């Protein structure tokens, strides 16, 4: 059990004899491999421009992945049955196991109650910036909620993604500011928050569930790019300004902004604020439309390239940046 590592017990390990490996939900590309869509995997390995002709097929499969998530058992059952509804029992069993583990291993009744509350109701806040005190009208104090979140974060069930205010490396999270809640698997979020039908019926994932599920799945795909256990995601927010960019990613010792947004380029005010103070000239927008590249000029006159990357190409983001810079 992941939650077994939450017990207040000191365990000694032989120095230099323990190797830590990151075990994460399956990525979209792993999902395609599991359902034998090797033809689409071959297309995704080509230059991004080549994916345009297959855009509808690729987005259909990505929407399926966003609904199902990356839990191996859920994907295996879907691969065998092609029935999205049939995998609900997998989600129910997993979530109940996490709740039982919290009660079994967490020391202290208050911490147990708070952790169980988060595991019951916290899914509805996926992709949102949250306040710890009185989280979800729970009545719990900030410290109690913070302790429970850190406990669940240590178990790799979720991550509190904190903002950075600099547009340069290194990435230093500002932990005194409000974090964004990202759960470890989108399929579980959809099931627990009761929004699967909305995602299934949506024509644009960015617009579904107020855009939060699009941020959640983007964060999940970004984390799948890294194999370091301690890797954390971050977003950018300028203090006292209101400008906020959904995520930032480091590439070749530089920080690149990522917006998850549909619509016209005129709606990218925060991205332009970031670029005006950045030392890069490439920004990324994740959306549901085909791959394209625009040239944008900020209000202050800086020109940069905006790479419009469909969701199914998030896994190629470093390759795309290599080609652009």
Please name every model-derived segment.
Residues 2-5, 25-29, 165, 188-189, ...:
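Conserved nucleotide-binding/hydrolysis micro-motifs of P-loop NTPases
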Residues 4-9, 29-33, 267-268, 292-297:
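Switch/connector loops and helix/strand junctions flanking conserved nucleotide-binding motifs
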Residues 7-124:
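Interdomain motor-coupling "hinge/lid" segment immediately C-terminal to the ATP-binding subdomain
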Residues 19-21, 182, 258, 282-286:
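Hydrophobic/aromatic beta-strand patches that form the interior of the parallel beta-sheet core
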Residues 76-249:
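Accessory nucleic acid-recognition modules appended to NTPase machines
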Residues 218, 222, 245-264, 283:
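Conserved catalytic cores of phosphodiester-cleaving nucleases, focusing on short active-site segments
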Residues 262-305:
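Catalytic cores of nucleic-acid endonucleases
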Residues 291-325:
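Domain-level recognition of nuclease-like catalytic cores that cleave nucleotide substrates
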């Amino acid at each position: 059990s992941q939650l077994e590592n939450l017990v207040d017990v000191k365990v000694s390990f032989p120095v230099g004899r323990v190797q830590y490996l990151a075990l994460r939900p399956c990525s979209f590309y792993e999902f395609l491999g599991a359902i034998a869509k090797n033809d689409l995997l071959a297309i995704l390995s080509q230059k991004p421009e080549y994916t345009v002709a297959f855009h509808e097929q690729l987005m259909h499969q990505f929407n399926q992945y966003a609904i199902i998530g990356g839990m191996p058992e859920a994907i295996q059952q879907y691969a065998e049955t092609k029935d999205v509804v049939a995998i609900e029992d997998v989600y129910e069993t997993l979530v109940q196991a996490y709740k039982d583990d919290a009660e079994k291993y967490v020391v202290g009744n208050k911490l147990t109650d708070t952790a169980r509350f988060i595991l019951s109701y916290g899914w509805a806040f996926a992709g949102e910036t949250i306040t710890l005190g009185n989280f979800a009208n729970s009545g719990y104090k900030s410290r109690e909620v913070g302790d429970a979140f850190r406990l669940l974060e240590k178990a790799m069930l979720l991550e509190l993604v904190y903002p950075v205010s600099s547009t340069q490396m290194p990435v230093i999270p500002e932990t005194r500011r409000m974090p964004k809640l990202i759960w470890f698997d989108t399929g579980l979020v959809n099931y627990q928050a009761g929004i699967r039908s909305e995602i299934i019926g949506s024509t644009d994932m960015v617009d579904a569930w107020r855009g939060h599920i699009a941020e959640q799945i983007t964060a999940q795909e970004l984390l799948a790019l890294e194999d370091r256990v301690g890797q954390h995601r971050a977003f950018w927010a300028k203090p006292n300004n209101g400008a906020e960019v959904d995520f930032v990613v480091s590439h070749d010792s530089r920080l690149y902004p990522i917006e998850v947004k549909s619509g016209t380029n005129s709606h990218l005010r925060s991205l332009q604020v970031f670029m005006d103070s950045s030392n890069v000239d490439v920004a990324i927008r994740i959306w549901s439309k085909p791959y394209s590249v625009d040239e944008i000029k900020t209000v202050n006159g800086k020109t940069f390239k905006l790479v419009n990357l469909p969701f199914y190409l998030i896994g190629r983001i470093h390759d795309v940046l290599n080609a652009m810079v």
